């Protein structure tokens, strides 16, 4: 059974995918997500925080992700880009969620929505990004 937070991440990823492709306003995407299957079982507060936070901070999040990539962020598939934006937002703004949980959730999103091996790429990028955004937490985990 999926947790309410996982459902909120799934819906946020779907909404951000739509936003990346269409450029629709966040409020319009939000309204569409409220009618989506699984919305009733999602953590609405977390969904709103991710969706609107990523749209608001997309340039800064993309700038944080860019040095961890092997190609320009614009060349990523929209699914991988949406997943990475969700994870970057959580790494940056939700320090209550352990970085390993953020990475694992992103890998699961990439497996669900992305291409065959996209999850491996997402995992590698987020490993680098978490080392930059969560220095103390990642260093402590690596010493164990």
Curated annotation (Swiss-Prot):
Q: Please, which domain of life does this record's source organism belong to?
A: Bacteria
Cellular component (GO) terms are:
cytosol
Q: Which InterPro entries match?
A: NusB-like_sf, NusB_fam, NusB_RsmB_TIM44
Q: Which GO terms describe its molecular function?
A: RNA binding
Q: Which GO terms describe its biological process?
A: DNA-templated transcription termination; transcription antitermination
Q: Does the keyword Transcription apply?
A: yes
Which SUPFAM superfamilies does the record match to this protein?
Answer: NusB-like
A Pfam family that this protein carries is NusB
Arranged from A to Z, the UniProt key words for this protein are: RNA-binding, Transcription, Transcription antitermination, Transcription regulation
Record family assignment: Belongs to the NusB family.
In UniProt terms, what function does this protein have?
Answer: Involved in transcription antitermination. Required for transcription of ribosomal RNA (rRNA) genes. Binds specifically to the boxA antiterminator sequence of the ribosomal RNA (rrn) operons.
Q: Matching PANTHER family, A to Z? A: ANTITERMINATION NUSB DOMAIN-CONTAINING PROTEIN (PTHR11078:SF3), N UTILIZATION SUBSTANCE PROTEIN B-RELATED (PTHR11078)
Please name the NCBIfam families in this protein's record: nusB
Could you identify this protein by its name?
A: Transcription antitermination protein NusB
Organism expressing this protein natively: Paraburkholderia phytofirmans (strain DSM 17436 / LMG 22146 / PsJN)
């Amino acid at each position: 059974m999926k947790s309410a937070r996982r459902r909120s991440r799934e819906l946020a990823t779907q909404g951000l995918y739509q936003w990346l492709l269409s450029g629709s306003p966040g409020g319009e995407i939000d309204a569409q997500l409220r009618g989506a299957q699984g919305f009733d079982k999602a953590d609405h507060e977390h969904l709103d925080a991710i969706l609107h936070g990523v749209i608001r901070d997309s340039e800064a999040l993309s700038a944080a992700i860019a040095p961890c990539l092997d190609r320009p962020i614009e060349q990523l598939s929209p699914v991988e880009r949406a997943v990475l934006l969700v994870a970057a937002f959580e790494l940056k703004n939700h320090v209550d969620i352990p970085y390993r949980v953020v990475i694992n959730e992103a890998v699961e999103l990439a497996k669900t929505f992305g291409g065959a091996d996209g999850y491996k790429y997402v995992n590698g990028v987020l490993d680098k990004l978490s080392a930059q955004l969560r220095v103390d937490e990642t260093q402590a985990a690596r010493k164990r």
